[in-house]
Amino acid sequence: MIIKIKEKEGLELYKKYMEADFPEDERPSYKEYKKLTISNKHDIYKYQENGETVAYFISIEKHNNILITHLAVIKRYRGMGVGKRLLNSIINFYKNKNLLIVEAESEKMANNENELDIIKRRKKYYMNAGFEEQKGIKYILTDVDYSILVYYYITKLTNIELTNIIKSIYNDVLPNMDYLKIESDEKDI
């Protein structure tokens, strides 16, 4: 079950799990996270099974489009199918929206074969659930190169349209866009 959590629990979640689950360059600092949480710029959700919190994610909504960030299964529940059930629940939870966007590290970010394998498995995880990799978008956030994967509830968008949606979402949440570089390989007509 997906449950939206309040500010205090969201801040506790950061300290308890996010710091361990995400490298420093892939998560906001605690100060930035607290500011976003207090200002209601994003929503924090936990995913529970049998009354236990087994996973969590952050979502940001703009014009019926959802960006999912920092999705993670809590370490002791990994390898038990929780991630698949979580992703299916998220897809169902947002079924009245236009699309879901997720960011997955680009294969360029791998420093070794083990990291490359993890990145490939992460992409496959999303694609097996129906997400499509949006090729032709260059997307770098806080110096991390990402691939964009999209689950469409509506007609597929062009790279330019999707790029504009992502810029719009991040502009609302993080108006200082110095650390976001995103562009489409399509020409604006």
What are these regions (language model features)?
Residues 46, 100-103, 133-135:
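A structural signal for short, well-ordered beta-strand segments and their strand-loop junctions
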Residues 79-95:
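Conserved acetyl-CoA-binding loop-helix of GNAT-fold acetyltransferases
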Residues 94-118:
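Conserved GNAT acetyl-CoA-binding A-motif
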